[in-house]
Swiss-Prot record:
Chain spans, region Disordered: 32-94
Ubl conjugation listed as a keyword: no
Cellular component GO terms, alphabetical: nucleus
Protein's UniProt name: Forkhead box protein fkh-2
Gene: fkh-2
Source domain of life: Eukaryota
One of the protein's GO biological processes: dendrite development
Pfam families for the chain: Forkhead (PF00250)
Principal subcellular localization: nucleus
Function as written in the Swiss-Prot or TrEMBL entry: Transcription factor. Plays a role in embryogenesis and later development, perhaps acting redundantly with forkhead protein pes-1.
Amino acid sequence: MARFSILDLCPDLVEEAVKIEQLHISTQPCIKQESTDISDPSTSIDTTDTMSTDYLHDESIDDERSESTLSKDSKSPSSSNSEEKTPSSPNDKPPFSYNALIMMAIKDSPEKRLTLAGIYEYIVTNYPFYRDNKQGWQNSIRHNLSLNKCFVKVPRNFDDPGKGNYWMLDATAEDEVFIGGATGKLRRRPSSLSRARMDAYKQYGAAAANLFPYFSPGMPALPRHPYLTAPNGFLPRQMMPIPAMPQVFAQPELLQLYINQQQSLFTKLQ
C-alpha cells in the first residue's frame, strides 16, 4: 500500500515550507556573526578600556585641579604672612615690659648697678622708641623700681660723686628670675629647695614639708568655736589651727625612707 501524505493534497504548502527553510538557513550566519561580535572579548575590552581611560583622564584632570587649588591654598597663607611680615624697625616699641628693661639695663652695666638716670640712658640708647615717645614711661620705670622686690636700692658711698642712689638686682633674683621669650616679662623659675619642698608636700603631706625651712603650706581654717565669740560681739583673734596628724607618721619606715632619699639634698643646702 502506498504511503499517503497531506503534502500530496497541498503542494503549495511544500513550496512555502522550502522557502521558509532556505530563508532560515540564509539568516543564521548573520545572527551567528552578530553574536560572535557581541561576545568577542577584544571588542568588549576595547570599549571598557576607552571608557576607563576617559574616566581616568577626567579624574587626572580633577586631581590636577585639586592639587593646583591645594597648592594655591597652601601657598596663600605663607604668601599672605610674608606680605604681612614686614621687617621690624628699630623705632618700633620693644616687646619687653618695664621690669624686663630695667633688668637688662642693670645686667648689662659693668658694675651690675645703675642709677635711675643710667637706666633711662640705657633704654633710650638701645630702644629709640622711648626717645621719641615720651608719654610717661619714665614714671612707670620709677614705679616698677620701687614696687618690684627684685630691685634693691643701694645708697651711694660718700666718696662716690654724683646724685641719686644705685639700683641692683636682688641676690635671689639673679638666678631665679629671667625674661620670658614669648611674653617679654619677668618670670621666676623654681629653685631646687622650693621644688624639693613641693615634692615632699605632694607625696607625704605637710609634716614632711615642714622638715624644710621657710615652708608654710596653706592649711584650711577650722570652724570658729562658740567660746571664741564674746557676748558683746567682739571677736578676738582666731587661734592658729593645729594641722591634723598626717598619715605619714603612721608609717615611720616611709618617712625614714624619704629622709634618706633627701639626705644628699640636705647636705647641699647646708
